Curated annotation (Swiss-Prot):
Name of the protein: Bis(5'-nucleosyl)-tetraphosphatase, symmetrical
SUPFAM superfamilies from the UniProt entry: Metallo-dependent phosphatases (SSF56300)
Biological source species: Escherichia coli O1:K1 / APEC
Family designation: Belongs to the Ap4A hydrolase family.
Top-level taxonomic group: Bacteria
Entry EC number(s): 3.6.1.41
Family annotation (Pfam families): Metallophos
GO molecular function, one term: bis(5'-nucleosyl)-tetraphosphatase (symmetrical) activity
Reactions accelerated catalytically: P(1),P(4)-bis(5'-adenosyl) tetraphosphate + H2O = 2 ADP + 2 H(+)
Entry keywords, A to Z: Hydrolase
Gene3D superfamilies: 3.60.21.10
Amino acid sequence: MATYLIGDVHGCYDELIALLHKVEFTPGKDTLWLTGDLVARGPGSLDVLRYVKSLGDSVRLVLGNHDLHLLAVFAGISRNKPKDRLTPLLEAPDADELLNWLRRQPLLQIDKEKKLVMAHAGITPQWDLQTAKECARDVEAVLSSDSYPFFLDAMYGDMPNNWSPELRGLGRLRFITNAFTRMRFCFPNGQLDMYSKESPEEAPAPLKPWFAIPGPVAEEYNIAFGHWASLEGKGTPEGIYALDTGCCWGGTLTCLRWEDKQYFVQPSNRHKDLSEGEAVAS
């Protein structure tokens, strides 16, 4: 019985299936953890959602920013961008079923026995685990309710960018969403910077990657995350696992077998068109 952690799939269905075949993943015996951003950019978002949903209790996933954006597109709040290649999913006969399932997925996964937590972008150093759990539940409750379109309409934005237990309403929900799904850099006090996307080496002072700032969760738990493909899975402290290695951009899809910490990779079926800055079919 093995636990496999896989980084952002981004619609790369063929690579996902090839990687699972490589590690001999067996639903019902093994468990698959996914860092979110199941959809967008790659050609197979529909197949990815259908497959992941079919795994039932054999999968544990977290929502990423692209998954939330898909829900906003489906709700008529955001525009369907051609580069996201979501039209086959949005027009599928089972789109309602798939997307209503998706919006009921969590932002945070915790395994106390393994001392493992997973969130798409990571865990802000301003939170302890109890706060992270409560914050995740706040957003999950709204997403799974009939009022979820109102939240999706208000989730876009970069403020507030500093946590306070006194935050209320949509501002609180927006901060939580950004921390779980969009965070990369923080100021030394843990305040989020939502603008910088470069590599840690190129970030302006005093910004630091969120995982470079000591926080209570990282003191007790391992943290697995995706979202930050330019890290290429490198440069994190012990116990912090960056799993997005840019499959949809021509990189690889990465899997970590938790029990022995062995990595497996599946090369992308796509290549990066440097002139366009977009992944195109090879």
